[in-house]
Amino acid sequence: MDEILKLLQTNALESRENIAKLTGLSAAEVATRIADYEKRGVIRGYQAVLNEDKLDLDTVTAVIEVKVTPQREGGFNTIAERISKFPEVRSAYLMSGTYDLLLFVEGRNLREVASFVSERLSPLEGVLSTHFMLKTYKRLGVLMHQDSSDERLSVSP
């Protein structure tokens, strides 16, 4: 992968000047390459990695495994693209193994996610199980909890 892209993945706010120093390119060349990556769709956007615990957000993320029958025309793409268009679906992946699709669905609360699953997703043939994340330890390469103290109680016979 291009060194500029690696640096931007680590810190999308890195200055063009600093990227130039780190890569040995001029700041103008760095800016030109980044603009080209954006134009060609190599860079699809920029996001901040948020620690939701610090924001006191009331969001629930559900991980949903979906088994589907491939369509005669379009294989898995037809159903995957249809599911991906739901605004509640934050990410969708084609998987190998027992399940065909892995979805990350977000809602304001458990009731909202459950409503999405029961009213919009479940009517689509093949939804087998739903798993809810309880805690995020690492997101997009960033550790969410720096406190190393272990607050669990010891278990003894």
Listing of model-derived features with the role each one plays in the protein:
Residues M1-P157:
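A compositional/biophysical signature of low hydrophobicity enriched in polar/charged and small residues
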